[in-house]
Amino acid sequence: MADQALVDQVSAKIDALAAEMIDALSEVVRIPSVNPKYPGQVYDEVVGGEGEVSKAFARHYEGIGAEVDLFAIEPGRENAVGVIKGAGGGRSLIYNGHVDVVPVGDPANWTGGDPFSGKIDGDRVWGRGATDMKSGIMAQTFAARALKECGIALKGDLILEAVAGEEVMDHECGVTATVKRGYTADAAIVSEPSSPPSPLAVVPVSPGLLWFSVTASGKATHSSMRGNSIRAGGDGAAVGVNAIDKGILIFNAMRQLEEEWGLTKKHPLFRPGHFSIHPGVIQGGPHGVMVPFFLSEFLTIDYCVWYSPDDDPEAVKREIETHIHRAAQTDAWLREHPPVVEWKLHWPANTPDADEITAVTVAAHEQAAVGSRFAGAPDIVGFAAVEDATFLTLGGVPAISYGPGDLRVAHADDEYVMIDEVVTACKTFAVAAMDWCGVV
């Protein structure tokens, strides 16, 4: 654990800097930094916001005295890295977060007005990116600043990172680009919002994500022929087959498998039932004529699969494909016209060898949160979603997560972050750096 006198000193400094930190957070929230590759975005109209936010963080890094590297794999999508060199003899640590955000949806649904207002309203800051995750990056940045202003020198290097690309797994443009550029360390803490189930939990693992589609085909004919195609004594498939009926068989099979997972897929750091097979998009109809006057020629369902970090993703794929195949065998048409499965994306689970940095973060939170509503030992949980910690771990840097904010308001209308979470997270980051890197 960090020396208590130093903890008290740096905590007092962060309290003194808190108003400035929240103002700085508001400023970066006001910069729209929607990921230009997010579905539905026109790239050339959106690109550039990520870079502007990274440049803002780079200015903060320069003010701390860090060695700053501002670079882009794609123009307008800069990553900012600030290296605070240690005196030697300590362990190195990366503090990482992503600057890109998801689209705001319909601005009319935001009750506070401008989704990028960055409004400071009593106990919270409003706006897209407040929780996910500009608050976390700012807390890490001001933790480093507080250490410097307290005259606390670390033995190990502290590397601050604000990266692009996370929201669409564009890690080659963001976090992986930093690793390939040589920015590695003995451990990393990604400041993703680590609630739910409780604020400021410590997150040593995350699930994996698979995106796939399954398409059932049909045979178009006039909708008045439905009875002839499905009733006993009719012409059956010879006249037509409604793909929607066939696709629903697959939908029901996936729902059955998901219910089985609720009983069989367990992990000690995840709530029961977390691992799921979510039908997120359904498209179907007659090709080219989206009216209900035909028997539909296709039904495609896109699924988002959340699987346990203990599971082999290839085994998960085989299980899903086997279940679809078995369902198809119950139907004469599907036996002859099997559903087509397409695997579209895989975001691997994060399973780092990170017991030490996890323990350091837990202890740092306990020291930093004294006297706050977050006092005591933090929960240790699995991350609900996926994150860049995966790609740091895959790049040889064991990475966990801890940060202010709540995933239940991330990607939602009226996103916000609680100010006291940002302040306590900032203190935790400062204490963790002292403990992990060592103090001269």
Q: Positions of the model-derived regions?
A:
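Metal-dependent amide/peptide-bond hydrolase catalytic core
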Residues: 1-9, 13-16, 69, 74, ...
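Acidic/His- and Gly-rich active-site-bordering loop/insert found
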Residues: 2-128, 149-154
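Residue-level signal for inorganic ion chemistry
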Residues: 28, 32, 192, 247, ...
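Catalytic metal-binding/acid-base residues of hydrolase active sites
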Residues: 34, 100, 109, 167, ...
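A short, acidic/glycine-rich surface segment
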Residues: 102-105, 171-172, 196-201, 262-263, ...
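Fold-level recognition of mixed alpha/beta catalytic cores in primary-metabolism enzymes, strongest
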Residues: 130-131, 135-258, 295, 411-427
